[in-house]
Every structure is written in structure tokens, then in C-alpha cells.
């Protein structure tokens, strides 16, 4: 759990912004959204595999674009 200590003479808005940023870095909101509804194990595996395929395609396209620029 992210903890933010409010500094002396620090506006509340700034402290709240720091807290939100620390929550974002910790991945709390993403975790809550992922656990909001039950996801069947088969669906989770399918989603993870699709994400891996997408990452691989993105990596290959970046490598191909770099090769084209070298010539």
C-alpha cells in the first residue's frame, strides 16, 4: 500500500497527486480492475496468449522497420 506523508505547508492537491502517482506505479488500480469480475482460467490463458502474440508482432515490426532504415 503506497504511503504518502504530507509535507509541511504542502497543498492537499499536491499530496493527492503524489498519492495517485504512487498508486499508479504500484499497479493497484490495474489489479482492482482485473479482479473486479471473475475470469475463468481458460479466458485468462487465452488473453495472456493473445497479449504475448501482440508483443511479439510489435517487436518484429520494430526490428523490420529498423532494418529498412539502415539501407
Curated annotation (Swiss-Prot):
Give the keywords, sorted.
Answer: Ribonucleoprotein, Ribosomal protein
Checking Pfam families in the record gives: Ribosomal_S21
Q: Which GO terms describe its cellular component?
A: ribonucleoprotein complex; ribosome
- Source domain of life is Bacteria
GO biological process, alphabetically ordered:
translation
Picking any one GO molecular function of the record gives: structural constituent of ribosome
Q: Which Gene3D superfamilies match?
A: Ribosomal protein S8
Q: Which PROSITE patterns match?
A: RIBOSOMAL_S21
Name the protein family: Belongs to the bacterial ribosomal protein bS21 family.
Name listed for the protein in its UniProt record: Small ribosomal subunit protein bS21
Q: Which organism is it from?
A: Shewanella amazonensis (strain ATCC BAA-1098 / SB2B)
Q: What is the lineage of its organism?
A: Bacteria, Pseudomonadati, Pseudomonadota, Gammaproteobacteria, Alteromonadales
